[in-house]
UniProtKB/Swiss-Prot annotation:
This is Uncharacterized 8.9 kDa protein. It comes from the Viruses.
């Protein structure tokens, strides 16, 4: 099986990044009703996605989200 070109994987990463924004925001708002929690999550996801674009992501998304809810919500 051939791998997708790197520009395609980066495009999918960016699309996945915006998908995370649309899914996480209502969950966090329902969870805490806290603006600071929401922007803390945005910041962590942004940092994580920037690292993942350059191939530095070592952890699975579910672990990332567990840590986000633990520390920010």
């Amino acid at each position: 099986m051939r791998h997708a070109p790197s520009y395609l994987s980066r495009l999918f990463t960016i699309v996945d990044f915006y998908w995370d924004f649309s899914m996480i925001r209502p969950i966090c708002t329902i969870w805490t009703y806290s603006i600071s929690c929401t922007y803390g999550i945005y910041l962590l996801i942004l940092i994580y996605r920037i690292f993942s674009i350059f191939g530095l992501d070592y952890y699975h998304d579910s672990l990332l989200y567990s840590l986000i809810f633990l520390f920010y919500c």
